[in-house]
Swiss-Prot record:
One of its GO terms (biological process) is negative regulation of DNA-templated transcription initiation. One of its GO terms (cellular component) is cytoplasm. One of its GO terms (molecular function) is transcription cis-regulatory region binding. It comes from Pseudomonas fluorescens (strain Pf0-1). This is Transcriptional regulator MraZ.
Amino acid sequence: MFRGANAISLDAKGRLAMPSRYRDELDSRSSGQLIVTIDAVDPCLCVYPLDEWEIIETKLRALPSLREENRRLQRLLIGNAVDLELDGSGRFLVPPRLREYAKLDKRAMLVGQLNKFQLWDEDAWNAVSAADLAAIQQPGAMPDELRDLIL
């Protein structure tokens, strides 16, 4: 399980180092193999261990292909998916096209989302986090099923 928001840096080649606290789990689950694709809702990237991505692919394959919405989602997620592998230093290269989509430059945030990570431009992450916090604090903004989760 991946938790927490981690400030990271991309080097001039577009490589970033996976925080060391996640490396052992990624190595044991998927031998350091990752899939990176766009997030279809937010302006960020999704980084999946290979075993989690295979579950997503199975679900996408099961969608009826005659529905345009399904084909659209498949095109976006699968068409932008890139196979990557952590190198000996725990780094991986984010391809230029995906860096451009998420507007990644030097400073980024790698955010654990339990089964995957989101990779954000740091400024975009800070803005979205502030907006999310403000929105959820509005009276009546939280659905009943979420209120039961709050400790």
